[in-house]
Amino acid sequence: MKTISIRDDVYRKLLEMKDEEDSFSDVIEKLLKRKKTDIRRYFGVLKDSEVLDEIEKSLNARKSARFRV
């Protein structure tokens, strides 16, 4: 076990993130794991999705729209 010093504002932010049963080490560990998340693991999750179809329709509609002044 080690002792570290942190600023008061950082302590308050960690405290806000902390669940009652969590230790501060748990909170810091969760934050470190988030940083390591590889965005490539989400590649293709919307494939064959109706949501993706709607997004594509919206983008195409925006591209073909003309500005009115």
From Swiss-Prot:
InterPro entries: Put_antitoxin. Keywords: Toxin-antitoxin system. HAMAP family: UPF0330. Belongs to the UPF0330 family. Possibly the antitoxin component of a type II toxin-antitoxin (TA) system. This is Putative antitoxin AF_1481. It comes from Archaeoglobus fulgidus (strain ATCC 49558 / DSM 4304 / JCM 9628 / NBRC 100126 / VC-16).
